[in-house]
């Protein structure tokens, strides 16, 4: 299995605080991977390390087996759209495409960028600063795709867009990826958009990877159980209780399934991606808080 992104013991520190710590991660080539976590979890730091904008303070990161800081030949395989989809606001879309060609002489598909923006109705002669937020995001995506990258890194590119612009951006992204078989690592808070488009999941919390794997496998191995008020006793067929809530008469558990059937006293329900992510984030928060106080989680 070819790996698009691989990290081992990866860490980045700002002063005494670790923005990312002991990060062990593998993203297989050909996947559309969602990178999820709260503000401050380390998502942007991870992406900046993967694109070579930062130097690790610990461990290593590899993109298709190579150090992203090793030279321009590695960077030629990486497309990157940063937060707020920055583009030169005084340049027109046509001028940005021309500039991109001069900066990426090894491989640049200007025709692809022009065709994509024309199909979206974005004028070639209007300064980027006068385009809408959604249009600027589409320009940034078109420029990244014009590199014909093997890996596309997107750092919350749709966070500030309205629902229609978000949908148009994600549709454009999915169409482009289907044509090119590009691997995507997409950071976002918008779980509903990710559930419709991503087939691989990476959850970051407290500067560490908390959960990773193919979305379909993770959803298959997790369930919500509703049943009689539970104490500390184990539930048959459950490997791990990720999150629990209780009323006087019943308990609701989000669990990782184990071997064998679930105890028939419990009603079993499928989980959504949002259920899964929020439960693991809450578990990580509770564990770190308990460790800080020196009490059992």
Language-model features: locations:
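The feature captures the beta-strand-to-loop junction immediately N-terminal to the Walker
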Residues: 36-38
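Helix-to-loop junction immediately C-terminal to a conserved catalytic motif
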Residues: 51
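Conserved ABC transporter NBD signature motif
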Residues: 59-74
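ABC-family P-loop ATPase nucleotide-binding domains
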Residues: 83-139
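Catalytic Walker B motif of ABC-type/P-loop ATPase nucleotide-binding domains
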Residues: 152-156, 161
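ABC transporter nucleotide-binding domain
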Residues: 167-256
């Amino acid at each position: 299995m070819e790996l698009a992104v691989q990290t081992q013991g990866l860490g980045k520190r700002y002063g005494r605080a670790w923005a990312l710590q002991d990060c062990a991660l593998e993203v297989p080539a050909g996947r559309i991977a969602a990178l999820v976590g709260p503000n401050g979890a380390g998502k942007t730091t991870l992406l900046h390390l993967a694109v070579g904008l930062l130097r690790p303070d610990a461990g290593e990161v590899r993109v298709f087996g190579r150090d992203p800081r090793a030279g321009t030949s590695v960077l030629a395989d990486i497309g990157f759209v940063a937060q707020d989809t920055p583009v030169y606001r005084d340049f027109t879309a046509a001028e940005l495409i021309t500039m991109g060609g001069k900066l990426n002489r090894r491989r640049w598909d200007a025709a692809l960028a022009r065709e994509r923006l024309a199909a979206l109705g974005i004028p070639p002669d209007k300064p980027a600063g006068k385009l809408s937020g959604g249009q600027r995001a589409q320009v940034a995506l078109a420029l990244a795709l014009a590199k014909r990258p093997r890996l596309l890194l997107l750092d919350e590119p749709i966070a500030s867009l309205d629902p229609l612009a978000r949908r148009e951006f994600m549709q454009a992204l999915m169409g482009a990826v289907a044509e090119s078989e590009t691997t995507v690592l997409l950071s976002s808070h918008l779980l509903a958009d990710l559930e419709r488009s991503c087939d691989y999941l990476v959850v970051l919390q407290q500067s560490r990877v908390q959960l990773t794997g193919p979305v379909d496998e993770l959803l298959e191995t997790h369930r919500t159980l509703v049943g009689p008020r539970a104490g500390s006793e184990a539930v048959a067929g459950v490997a791990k209780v990720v999150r629990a809530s209780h009323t006087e008469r019943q308990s609701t558990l989000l669990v990782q399934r184990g071997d064998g059937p679930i105890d028939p006293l419990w009603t079993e329900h499928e989980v959504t991606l949002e259920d899964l992510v929020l439960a693991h984030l809450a578990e990580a928060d509770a564990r770190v808080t308990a460790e800080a106080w020196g009490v059992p989680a």
